[in-house]
């Protein structure tokens, strides 16, 4: 049987809307996630976090679905930024790749964009680091049945650079 895909993008921490959507598409509650209908699989296009009131619940639902095989998930720019927010930049000691520690306009903007997620996971906590670690496992694209699934756009040169760096599965 050929698998059909339900493509879902930009949830941004809105768990109630996600749960409603999954139910309307025939997904059944299963543990902390949902089970796909026969012959279907959810494909989340990233941007699971930032903005919404229940970001950790969204992450729990999506991760449970990925772990059970009911879904696949790719990295969105908000998850990419969350990784950079925690990763020290050796070229700029005392700062992260996503600047947030200095009192500069860019660092203040980056903190503001990420403030809701940080409040919900506890900035710098084990929970925060754990989710960032999981984000690193997410591919930046998927090839599904002859189709490519990406969050924002496709660039052959960028994809080739990722593959040359050893990220052949698309994960960071």
Locate predicted features.
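Active-site neighborhood of divalent metal-dependent phosphoester bond hydrolases
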Residues: 52-59, 64-172
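N-terminal active-site segment of His-dependent metallophosphoesterases
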Residues: 1-61
């Amino acid at each position: 049987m050929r698998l059909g895909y339900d493509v879902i993008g930009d949830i941004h921490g809105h768990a109630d809307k996600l749960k409603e959507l999954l139910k309307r598409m025939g997904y059944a509650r299963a543990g902390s996630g949902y089970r796909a209908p026969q012959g279907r699989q959810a494909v989340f296009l990233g941007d699971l976090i930032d903005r919404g009131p229940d970001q950790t619940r969204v992450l729990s639902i999506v991760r449970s679905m990925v772990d059970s095989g009911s879904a696949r998930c790719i990295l969105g720019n908000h998850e990419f930024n969350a990784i950079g927010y925690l990763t020290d930049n050796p070229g700029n000691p005392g700062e992260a790749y996503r600047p947030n520690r200095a009192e500069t306009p860019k660092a203040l903007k980056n903190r503001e964009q990420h403030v809701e997620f940080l409040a919900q996971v506890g900035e710098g906590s084990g929970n925060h680091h754990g989710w960032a670690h999981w984000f690193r496992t997410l591919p930046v694209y998927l090839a599904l049945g002859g189709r490519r699934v990406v969050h924002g756009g496709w660039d052959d040169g960028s994809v080739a650079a990722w593959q040359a760096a050893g990220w052949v599965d698309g994960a960071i």
